[in-house]
Amino acid sequence: MIILGIDPGIAIVGYGIIEYKNSKFKAIDYGAVTTPAHMNISRRLELVYKGIDTIVKNYNIDEVGMEELFFNKNVKTAITVAQARGVTMLACAHNGKPVYEYTPLQVKQGVVGYGRADKAQVQQMVTSFLSLKKVPKPDDVADALAVAICHAHSNKLEKTLKNIGGKYV
């Protein structure tokens, strides 16, 4: 399975493409879609859309995992990140790719096994799972890879439960 992990934002959208096959991970590509701060918000959203659309079209993506919006005290920032999430989801939907959302707690549990893990612990596990020589930068890229790994683990659990007649909640 080829999974695209996305850490949404308006200035930086981290992405990570992994292959999960036979319980093994392989990094295919990772990086960031960036937008200049001085640019009009509608133009920035267009750049985010086009960047994700190009990534989805260039790879044989099966599914997409995306981090849910973490609401902070800055409402204006939360709104622009929500807008970026929307155009990112739209780019995936236009290409027929299902998007699964995960909270930061779920991502940490799915990668480290502990929902209160710190950023360094998550990055260390991402590097280990994907056999990378160093932690991907910026942090948004490592976060996107973590989302992809979390989705692989969640998807495997859901399929296992379906096979035994259970239900994943």
Curated annotation (Swiss-Prot):
The keyword Metal-binding applies. SUPFAM superfamilies: Ribonuclease H-like. CDD domains: RuvC. It is found in: Cytoplasm. Mg(2+) 1 binds at D7, D140. One of its GO terms (biological process) is DNA repair. It comes from Clostridioides difficile (strain 630) (Peptoclostridium difficile). This is Crossover junction endodeoxyribonuclease RuvC.
